[in-house]
């Protein structure tokens, strides 16, 4: 089937495959409070689940309102499984370079050159002498030129486009790697064939050029003047855990990539029992299974090594972390805490608490201090890792002579209002409604719903997680918010 598809199109054009996925949250104005009391469902239809014979999990969310499907393959493998090496991210790039049948005019002739390139990268990783390294790099360059004679750049993307595909992309996080795109439902056979094929027999071609792309990405991040401070905070917060190293890899590791290590990473984690397929849109789950068994069912069966959660350091005994920000005149302070994880019974109350601090309408407790000029700006943030949820807030005093101590005091005064229940009932209901409305809108859009299900699969929350969360949001009371806010007290670990 794949060979037939390839023969239909042989067009090459330059494209970039990697893009960090951005998840957007939509908020409504407080006028929607007038609609309180009406029913609301977090999802438009239930998710249908089944497992292929090789252990691969399939979640299908049908939505026949538009003729499109959003498909995502989720691998529970990311930066935490290769700390500091950047292998998960490197491999994500390689997955767009084709297979033994896609992206090549003659794989049998190409393979010896690719094997030689892999061996040279292994040699480079073990060589410290600069002169010898330069010789190896030059040899790799000459081998890459020879191998390039057989490569067809961008063929995978072109095939996806030929068969109704768009938005082709991927991303790597600490906990997962996700490959996704939108496609027309009449091409589901071709989509399944192409996407399963690259998960069975990826070929590590055109690596030298992709290495340069990753370096450019690293340099792009390095151009951010706040990056050094962010990386220092990351090492401090997560020391002793797989989350302390940069996701893209350390500079030293990036200089010594090994294709053989990427192959081992693929063999270890890209197995049926460690992968999920999410399909949202105009598909019929009841008729899909035979097709998926013929395509994704070909992926090698197996389970990945068990992940062990490493405890975070005890932040309560750590000193304040002092960071230098390269912004003249501006001072900033903040706090970072552990938050309730995604399936924690207090999760819904925690989300309401964060919304009461700051929201799109700028009516939160921290927002009010910005609106009235008590400080320049403030914002709470929360982020969910597979193992932990972090909650934090940063604040900036008035410029140029605002006091950081005063801003700190104002911050805790607002937190105290949460702990003491000094919140208007309508503000509580508005926060709940806003969060529920976001869940509802996510359920109405194939891409947003897919994003929710990708996260739920990766973090092992279950496909019913959005509904579970919506049910608990409806039940949140002010007493729940007070209880959840109580642990956040002055004197715990700070960032400034």
Predicted regions and their residues:
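Bacterial N-terminal signal peptides that target proteins for export
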Residues: 5-28
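Bacterial N-terminal signal peptides
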Residues: 28-37
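Boundary at the C-terminal end of the N-terminal hydrophobic targeting segment
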Residues: 41-44
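M16 family metallopeptidases and their MPP-like homologs
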Residues: 61, 66-81, 87-90, 104-197, ...
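Catalytic Zn2+-binding segment of zinc metalloproteases
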Residues: 93-103
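An aromatic/glycine/proline-enriched structural segment found at the starts
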Residues: 198, 202-206, 219-222, 237-247, ...
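Non-catalytic, conformational "gating/processing" segments within enzyme and secreted inhibitor domains
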Residues: 204, 208-212, 226, 230-231, ...
